[in-house]
UniProtKB/Swiss-Prot annotation:
Single GO MF annotation: cell-cell adhesion mediator activity
Single biological process term from Gene Ontology: homophilic cell adhesion via plasma membrane adhesion molecules
Disulfide bonding pattern of the chain: C174-C224
Chain positions with Phosphothreonine modification: T332, T334
Keyword terms: Cell adhesion, Cell junction, Cell membrane, Disulfide bond, Glycoprotein, Immunoglobulin domain, Membrane, Phosphoprotein, Repeat, Signal, Tight junction, Transmembrane, Transmembrane helix
Modified residues (Phosphoserine): S301, S336, S339, S344, S371
Disordered as annotated region, ranges: 316-365
Source organism of the structure: Macaca fascicularis
Name the record gives this protein: Endothelial cell-selective adhesion molecule
Record localization: Cell junction, Adherens junction; Cell junction, Tight junction; Cell membrane
Membrane topology: Single-pass type I membrane protein
Residues listed as glycosylation sites in the UniProt record: N108, N169, N213, N236
Amino acid sequence: MISLPGPLVTNLLRFLFLGLSALAPPSRAELQLHLPANQLQAVEGGEVVLPAWYTLHAEVSSAQPGEVPFVMWFFKDKEKEDQVLSYINGVTTSKPGVSLVYSMPSRNLSLRLEGLQEKDSGPYSCSVNVQDKNGQASGHSIKTLELNVLVPPAPPSCRLQGVPRVGANVTLSCQSPRSKPAVQYQWDRQLPSFQTFFAPVLDVIRGSLSLTNLSSSMAGVYVCKAHNEVGTAQCNVTLEVSTGPGAAVVAGAVVGTLVGLGLLAGLVLLYHRRGKALEEPANDIKEDAIAPRTLPWPKSSDTISKNGTLSSVTSARALRPPHGPPRPGALTPTPSLSSQALPSPRLPTTDGANPQPISLIPGGVSSSGLSRMGAVPVMVPAQSQAGSLV
């Protein structure tokens, strides 16, 4: 088919039709255009035929030899009127998807529309002007019909709103994004047993199904059907009713765990800081305490008894053995030396004479030598022959 001319040519063709009608002389033939219906419906994606034909009064219905029709089809949308097909002087021009049902010349002017879309809805006008074999116009007629393109429901989407647990309330929603006319919804449960729902739990306009006080027996596969005059589409959702704790209990357990972990981390951090605080004073340098003074010890010459009588030799009560006399060769500890083995001296007895001083220096070593060796002199008290201290 030849593509349609522009709007300017369309207007010129319309003026041509009007001119032919005005110049037509009076004639016994009267042209009548017939459209059997004022409205037609079709489905999007399909095709439709807009029926139209004309007759001449007092003549047969079929075209006569030399009869020349001029045909134009127009479509008017919300903004402007467009020419979709024309047949003039044996030449047909049309838009894609638009054609005449019968070959021309013919008195049947039916128009076929293919690949319909919703935007093709609107009024269509057919205009016809006929000339006889002598080139004289036999008449002119124009009529309009309305086309309504219906759209079947697009596949809906099913959703579950709420937490499906025992005793809770949930809502099943179903929504189709596109349809003409508007769809209505129906919810059914298919498995494990069939069940149909009605108002008030079912909203056929919004497509919502309210389920209250859930129980385990209400679980199953729920199917939503969206339907209108020209089609049906459906979706489904599986409802599983749980008996576990609710969302609030789970959330509380999670929050409690997080708080416990936070407190534990705080205690560990506090313990770590206190450990550092105790280590720092231990590493500080402190001044040592003053050493005690050393008492002077008497010289070794002062260890001899003033009366010249030495009954026993001892260092101090702390240096004596706790029980019994010291054994020969016992260790005698001193404040500044480790221990030395000193023999226990024996007091010689004389008849009525005063005893002579006995040197306590063993081995014949002098007191000055012992001092150089580190020995410490010890004050020994004198005793009388009766055993009392002098």
